[in-house]
Amino acid sequence: MKHPGSEKPQRTIAVTGGAGHFGGMVMRRLVEEPTVAKVISLDVRPPGWSHPKLEGVVGDVRDPELARLLEGVDTVVHLAFLISRYKPRSLYESINVEGSKNVFRAAVAAGASQIVYSSSVAVYGLVRDHPVPITEDTPRVHQPDFSYNDAKFRVEAFLDEFEAEHPELIVTRFRMVAALSPGVESMMGRSLTRGVIPSTSDVPWPIIWGEDVADALVLGVRQRARGAFNLSTEEPMSARDLAAAAGMRSLRFPRWLGVLAARLSSIADKLGLGNALDPAWIKYSDAVLVLSSDKARRELGWQPRCNTALEVLQRFRAESSETS
């Protein structure tokens, strides 16, 4: 009879994009898993911390010899993604789309039995006629003029075919709304730390706590869960209502001005002052993106620390002030 915690560590988990902020959150959880013997951080730079179970491997998701680096890996958690659309389009495409395909093919070639992919609410498309709430069965919508959606949509479309070709492979997908976490440079984060919530419409503001996303991914690894899982908070609120409840200021501006500001943010991006915001996020900001996370709660036992958007915002501001 096995006793809790008596499992022998035997799993090796590789995390692409492991040196990033979110990758670090996921790996710090994985090294504490009793069944995990080793966690491999696969990134173009080494992780900024150490642990007896952690191995840093400097590599590129586009490497044609990637399967060699993944030998002996049981599960691949694919987080690597170039967010800024202002990098050369060829680079954006090669890392986010072709790089993802290469990771999945290399994982199978190396003998991995599970792939965990960090997708996004964006795969459903930023459109106005979504059902409320959006479930995992809601059709995905391709928006080629929205680079983030274009990449995430095409990767998931590839995964559909790849999964059908490899029925023995466990494919786990997480589609989350915008995750807030202190220490991540962004236009939105800087605005929130100043006590301002910007918006162009009164649609619900979809946000989630970054730590809760990391928890969900680790649950997917631990349980070897198959399928897609939405991740969001409950009790959605508009930016105006959220600001009032949090004691913050709501800054409402016309959409055209937001698009212009997003385009100008490319200057900050090029200067290394944070990621630029794709103007498409503003262009389609009247989209209603209310996700149901019932499946993740029911099948994974996911219990987020922050259940509502208001709790996410309050925690973000509290922890941001502590680290500033």
Please tell me what each predicted stretch does.
Residues K2, S293-E299, Q303-S324:
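Amphipathic terminal alpha-helices
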Residues G48, L54, V58-E98, A106, ...:
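NAD(P)H-binding glycine-rich loop region in Rossmannoid oxidoreductase-like domains
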